[in-house]
Amino acid sequence: MKVAIIGATGYGGIELIRLLEQHPYFSIASLHSFSQVGECITNVYPHFQNVLVHTLQEIDAEEIVKEAEIVFLATPAGVSAELTPKLLAVGLKVIDLSGDFRMKDPFIYEQWYKRAAAKEEILSKAVYGLSEWKRSEVQNANLIANPGCFATAALLATLPLVRSGIIEEDSIIIDAKSGVSGAGKTPTTMTHFPELYDNLRIYKVNEHQHVPEIEQMLAEWNRETKPITFSTHLIPISRGIMVTLYAKVKREMEIEQLQKLYEETYEQSAFVRIRTQGEFPSPKEVRGSNYCDMGIAYDERTGRVTVVSVIDNMMKGAAGQAIQNANIIAGLEETTGLQHMPLYL
């Protein structure tokens, strides 16, 4: 099956290229850019030399559909909302890595993203692509809203507790830390090497755009869920996310019960790995892979459960999950082309 990538020169775009070039079923028909049309991709990123030869093209839905069936949008928020109606109109399936189609309520999107929302008729067609929890919906979708990186790690950790109804609905606290690639390719003062090296920064306190995305998905599984407390930090690594979830249980529990809950929830999910009791993952252990690793603890003194969830923000948090969703759409095994062993060193 032929695919196209729009926004091919951003970090999400080049990760898609890397994965798709190794995929046994998908092949890249075309690469598209806004600012570097006419350039060979190897001139922009020399690490692709002798691997692929593609000239970056203009974005024309009528031309793209002549060769491709699926389009990956690795474009910023706002851009995807503008492009997607044209792509859907010519019969293309769209997997969008931005946040433009994640929120069902356009008012909430505008409140958190500070920009105009996509048209409601397009929003209504979008399926939120958290693969492990939305398989049946993804399978028949024409438009996938690929989840955010923080939201992916947070939701995979939180949903088993929320669905089971064993935690106090107003007790969810999520502390998240991310590598700098999650901030995108465009440099800022905060991501500048002298500012970030040997340092740690909290940002978007109480206003991160993944908050409503997480709350919306939690509410699908438990309408009693209340607003969450969510904080994000930038740490001096290139890629990787660690989310630590805290929540208070409604009744006394044993750690074995919680361990069993997670193991049973994800026993059919190839990319979610639950650590044995008392062990906890680190981002390095999933780097370069599509895995989400989790460890669970329970504090009998406070009645709080702690879940540690780690992913590679460029893989399970972006390009890897996008291809996982494309596999589902194409009727392939979810793991096709994604069985990469983590790059530990």
Curated annotation (Swiss-Prot):
Transmembrane segments: none annotated. SMART domains: Semialdhyde_dh (SM00859). Keywords: Amino-acid biosynthesis, Arginine biosynthesis, Cytoplasm, NADP, Oxidoreductase. Its main location: cytoplasm. It comes from the Bacteria. HAMAP family: ArgC_type1. This is N-acetyl-gamma-glutamyl-phosphate reductase. It comes from Bacillus cereus (strain ATCC 10987 / NRS 248).
